[in-house]
Amino acid sequence: MKLHLKYLWIVLVACTLTACMNGGGDLAGKWQLRQYQYADGTSEKVDSVFYNFQKGSFSAICLLKDGGVTTFFGNYSLKGAEISIILLPESVNDKNYDTYFGWPEGKRTFKVEDLSYSSLRLEYEGQKSIFRKF
């Protein structure tokens, strides 16, 4: 009987740990963009953009100045210290695209400078985008 309880306990712990895994490592989930840091040393605070990463799917929720919301969709791939984001054509054609993205051809590859359970820092040509887990 004790042996059965021991195995049952091991199975329950394994199931619990598996259920807690998000399948995308530390990157999976919602991130709030907090700041841009530019190569010239200046910075810009941001609080109205949220990136979401989940099993290869990407979305960005952007709060508009008029109180509305717009969402951009795409895909991402994380390979080593680089993340590539490709937005769907419908998102690139959105009237707010240039305000929030403006990436040529709707795609960008960032260097991942920092990725932990609570912070994310992406770099592209000297510009850093700093996020916090939301």
Which residue ranges define each predicted feature?
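Sec-dependent bacterial lipoprotein signal peptides
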Residues: 1-20
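Lipid interaction determinants
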Residues: 20-75, 79-134
